[in-house]
Regions:
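Transmembrane beta-barrel wall of Gram-negative outer-membrane proteins
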Residues: 301-410, 444, 512-518, 523-539, ...
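Membrane-embedded beta-barrel scaffold of Gram-negative outer-membrane proteins
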Residues: 149-150, 309, 447-477, 708-714, ...
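Solvent-exposed loop segments that connect transmembrane elements
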Residues: 335-376, 411-434, 475-508, 548-613, ...
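Short acidic/polar hinge/loop motifs at secondary-structure boundaries
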Residues: 220-225, 229-260, 310, 353
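Structural signature of Gram-negative outer-membrane beta-barrels, strongest in the C-terminal barrel
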Residues: 390-394, 523-525, 531, 535-539, ...
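C-terminal beta-signal and adjacent terminal beta-strands/loops
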Residues: 549-550, 554-556, 832, 904-917, ...
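N-terminal periplasmic accessory domains that precede
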Residues: 124-125, 184-187, 204-207, 220, ...
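Gram-negative outer-membrane beta-barrel transporters
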Residues: 532, 638, 780, 784-790, ...
Length: 993
């Protein structure tokens, strides 16, 4: 034993010491460290408090002890000294944010047989214990067979997933790589209780727990559709749009979190049913990293695909400044064939049948698509980059700046035609389009996040600015099968001498979205018995959309349409149809010069029969707070939170048409097409503010370290909005009667009037859940039972008669469900993961729809399209069962870390929409039943050192899963899963200091 000649003298000295002298303190500690056996060195509580550095700002997961000590040092500024052989084979326990350094280090070392001692206030030695003091039995150190802990930020602070009392599904970056998932369509199938309805990449609505009613067409949805009830976040920035999900390419992501149930307290409007959060990897201050992934794949019945992404992490100033960047490109080959076809008018066309007694006028023009017919005509390409810079001012303050860019370009369509517009069956994976179609979707996002501390409180500022531009062109030739096409495409001096010109038609949508958000939040340390988080939030959305429908035959002397220059008013009030036609005015109407707000003030080209030019504004101001109180410390916790928000929505612009052109056309003055209908939305003064509280309460019981029970009551909401045209009384509404006796009732009551505005809907959730670990943390089983009540549901309806999309407030729905998920480390190499959800939804209260005279509509007695369906009807996108299972076996073969995995996914049948009795061109209901399906994926691979190679197969049975069906392009289009795909993926990773 080493002797210490000064020890007795030190013990004889007066206990008085200088409280402010780090030098004296360091000398004392050095003496103790040299002379005292490590096992006898216990720092007094007062000294430990004096030496306690900054509390942890983030959780540190269980991992090899050297890496855990390194992570602790980065957060606290402590330096650790140890002999590598002492710690190299040890694993740490996980520690939570908010703990002080001493408590965190003590927790890390539990069960390892190691102790620590202070050399100086900021230098600590780790060494083997010589004497084990009397204490509770040490816990078993984590082993390689234990399941890895997952850290999430669902409560706006870093926590172990198993300690968060809510249903959360997490796909880590490692999991995404194992699943070879890079886009939303790749990973959504592995999320029980999550579905999506859409017509192609970046053209979907996301639904959680079956809270869906269906969607209208993507054209004009930006300004006429309700906002999604599931929020999409890129780090701290929300980025959802109606019918157009932000399909962020999953390169260099830390994880994707799916928070289920209302998240209105911490995430606000739009998070009514849940949140999908893309969390990016952040720059590392102490390591240089480089990663490259390359892949090639071939799709059955389709073209080849390829992808390449590269990531670089580079410290610029040691422990202070680092940058991280990722760049990616992926081209996915098409698999839909545009078949050669000829389009000729038919006696069954609604317009031909109505006006010409099923006789096609002589000399009517036919067209073909021979010049654009092609196989595999729907490729999609993702190109993008993300650059991040992290600057740490000191141990308390840091700033993160992120710049993201992505460009997605898709050709063709992603929905096969089950039958063409005449109802004739079509081959698998085929369509018949007569004009080029494409979708271009680009976004840029700049975000700044500042983290800091003031005393014990943690402060976070998060600000971001998103710009998203969409340009889409789609073939619309099948519109000629409808009832109104003859008004625009057929003309003659008399009905007997009418000629129908080309049926070729397209629509062109240009949408620009800007979103600015700012949030300031403050939180207490996570280990306080009473802890809280609160904040202020502001966001400003603006959606500018122009949609032009080109289906008008431009005959001599036709006058092109343009934005309205004013509106008609009666006694100073804007007339309902406030256009530029005298026919839409009433006696005493006066024209008021007042140009509508225009994104494009120009006269439209000839052939443009109808256009929208609308700007939609959406502003939210909110304040929120949530408090946790440990009724029984570390055992029973009560949480209560609320959010007050004021949401303003507005709309300006115009909807302009040329429907006053007549079948009988005389080029001599007066030309009927000099007139137009023009709705000046500025005159409607479309501006509403919705405000109120939405709250959340939770009681969680930590039965033991591995068993959490909780009950949650929570509320969510979604703001209201406007329909682009308040329909006048008559048959032009999407709810228009389609036959007797509905037509007679419509005539009796003055027709149906589409509401000018739709109100917010709301969701209330009651949930009982559990999170458990078993078998020495080799088995995880989580689950929840819930009831959700969705009231005044916003329903998107598509008017087949005149192709008009509107949003209505429908009835009340109730959803009962059960979810469960499990992970089992069966052996050291075999891991099985599974998830399942059972859902039952029904309409419990019918919505109220009124005739123009205010009389309620009785859908049960009339042949009318009911947006909600009859009582007891299920929601759309709500399969009664969803489930998946994934098995992965890892083993070492010839020095390589090899693996094999297989995945299976099953989804039961569901409906595409709640809409009922609206006819389609093939007859029957548009509430299409989507059959259930099962798909299988598999992968084999091996890695050595920095290299990894894998071969994978997706949809191995080449199942044609029907994901969504719609009729918005005037034929039944069915979005199907990508056919069987076999691919090769090669990865390389470098890491150094």
């Amino acid at each position: 034993m080493q002797k210490c000649p000064n020890r007795k003298r030190m013990g004889d000295q007066s206990p008085r010491r200088s409280t402010g002298s780090a030098t004296v303190m360091s000398a004392v500690l050095r003496a103790l460290s040299i002379c005292a056996p490590a096992a006898l060195l216990d720092i007094p509580p007062t000294l430990a408090q004096a030496l306690e550095p900054t509390a942890l700002a983030a959780d540190i997961p269980a991992q090899p002890l050297p890496q855990a000590l390194e992570a602790l040092g980065r957060q606290t500024g402590l330096q650790f000294v140890y002999v590598s052989g002492v710690v190299q084979d040890q694993r740490s326990h996980a520690v939570s944010a908010g703990l002080g350094a001493n408590k965190a280090l003590t927790r890390m070392l539990e069960g390892t047989g190691l102790k620590f001692e202070y050399l100086t206030p900021h230098n600590i030695r780790i060494l083997a214990a010589v004497v084990v003091p009397l204490q509770e039995p040490t816990k078993k150190a984590p082993s390689d067979e234990e399941l890895q802990e997952v850290i999430v930020t669902a409560n706006r602070r870093e926590q172990n997933l198993q300690n968060v009392p809510m249903t959360i599904q997490v796909l880590t970056g490692e999991t995404l790589a194992k699943l070879n998932a890079t886009t939303f369509d790749d990973f959504v199938k592995y999320l029980p209780a999550v579905t999506a309805h859409g017509v192609g990449p970046s053209q979907s609505n996301i639904y959680v727990r079956g809270l869906a009613t269906g969607a209208s067409g993507v054209q004009s949805s930006g300004v006429t559709g309700g906002f999604p009830n599931v929020a999409v976040y890129l780090d701290e920035q929300s980025a959802q749009l109606p019918n157009r999900n932000l399909d962020i390419y999953a390169a260099d992501l830390d994880r994707i979190e799916i928070l289920e149930g209302p998240q209105g307290t911490l995430f606000g409007a739009g998070a009514e049913a849940g949140v999908v959060r893309y969390i990016t990897n952040k720059p590392k201050l102490d390591v240089t990293e480089a990663m490259v992934n390359a892949g090639y794949a071939t799709t059955a019945h389709g073209d080849q695909s390829s992808n390449l992404d590269a990531t670089l992490n580079l410290p610029l100033i040691a422990d202070q400044l680092a940058v991280r960047a990722v760049i990616y490109n992926e081209r996915r080959g098409g698999y839909i064939n545009n078949l050669p076809a000829t389009f000729a008018r038919a006696p069954t066309d609604l317009g031909i049948a109505t006006y010409f007694n099923h006789n096609v006028p002589a000399n009517s023009v036919s067209i073909n698509n021979f010049n654009i017919a092609a196989n595999h005509f729907n490729p999609v390409t993702y190109t993008g980059l993300r650059a991040e810079a992290l600057y740490r001012l000191d141990q308390d303050w840091s700033a993160l700046l992120v710049q993201s860019y992505q460009n997605m370009e898709a050709d063709g369509v992603f929905a096969e035609m089950a039958a063409n517009s005449l109802g004739e069956p079509q081959p698998d994976l085929s369509a018949q389009l007569f004009n080029p179609s494409y979708d271009k979707d680009k976004f840029e996002n700049t975000a700044l996040t500042i983290n800091g501390r003031v005393g014990a409180l943690k402060l976070v500022y998060a600000g971001a600015y998103l710009v998203r531009n969409v340009e889409q062109v789609q073939d619309y030739t099948n519109y000629a099968r409808g009832g109104y096409a003859v008004y625009y495409q057929c003309a003659g001096p008399t009905l007997a001498r009418v000629q129908c010109f080309t049926p070729s038609a397209t629509w062109h949508d240009r949408e620009r979205n800007t979103h600015q958000s700012h949030e300031l939040r403050v939180s207490t340390p996570a280990d306080w018995r009473v802890r809280g988080i609160g904040g202020l939030f502001y966001e400003n959305y603006q959606i500018q959309e122009q949609v032009d429908w080109f289906y008008l035959t431009a005959l001599p002397d036709f006058n092109p349409i343009g934005p309205p220059t004013g509106y008609y008013a009666v006694n100073g009030s804007p007339f309902q149809q406030n256009g530029t036609l005298a026919m839409f005015s009433t006696p005493g109407a006066v024209f008021v010069p007042a140009p509508a707000t225009s994104n494009n003030p120009n006269i439209r080209p000839l052939g443009d029969a109808f256009f929208d030019d609308i700007t939609r504004g959406y502003k939210q101001k909110a304040a929120y707070a949530s408090v946790d109180f440990e009724v029984v410390p570390q055992t029973l916790t009560l949480t209560a939170g609320t959010r007050y928000s004021s949401t303003n929505t507005s709309e300006v612009g115009s909807a302009v048409g040329s429907e006053t052109c007549e079948l009988t056309y005389n080029p001599a003055p007066p030309n009927p097409c000099l007139n137009r209908s023009a709705i000046n939305l500025n005159a409607e003064e479309l501006d509403r503010t919705f405000s109120g509280f939405k709250s959340r309460a939770n009681l969680s019981w930590k039965v033991n370290e591995d068993f959490l029970l909780y009950y949650t009551w929570s509320q969510g909401f979604r703001a209201g909005g406007f329909n682009r045209t308040p329909f006048p009384a008559g048959s032009n509404s999407p709810l228009a009667p389609n036959g007797e006796p509905g037509q007679a009732q419509a005539d009796k009551h003055g027709g149906y009037v589409t509401p000018l505005a739709f109100a917010p809907d709301s969701l209330t959730n009651n949930e009982l859940g559990w999170k458990t670990m078993w078998m020495d943390r080799r088995l995880q089983w989580n689950g929840a039972i819930y009831q959700e009540d969705w009231n005044r549901t916003q329903i998107g309806a598509y008017g087949f008669v005149i192709a008009e999309g509107v949003t209505l407030n429908g009835g009340n729905y109730r959803v009962h469900g059960v979810e469960t998920s499990g992970v089992a480390r069966v052996t050291s190499g075999l891991t099985i993961e599974t998830g399942a959800a059972w859902n039952h939804s029904e309409l419990v209260k019918q919505g109220t729809y009124l005739w123009a005279d205010g009389t309620p509509i009785n859908f049960g007695a009339l042949k009318l399209p009911n947006p909600s369906g009859p009582l007891g009807s299920p929601l759309a996108g709500a399969p009664p069962f969803q489930g998946n299972v994934r098995a992965r076996y890892e083993l070492a073969i010839y020095g390589c870390e090899s693996f094999a995995q297989v995945n299976a996914v099953h989804q039961a049948h569901s409906l595409a929409t709640t809409y009922r009795l609206e006819p389609d061109l093939q007859g029957g209901s548009t509430a299409y039943d989507l059959p259930g399906f099962t798909t299988f994926d598999a992968a084999l691979g091996a890695g050595k050192d920095a290299w990894l190679v894998q071969v994978y197969g997706e949809n191995l049975t080449d199942t044609r899963a029907q994901l969504y069906a719609n009729y918005t392009q005037w034929y039944k289009g069915v979005t199907v899963s990508r056919p069987r795909t076999i691919g090769l993926r090669l990865s390389y990773k470098f890491s150094g200091r």
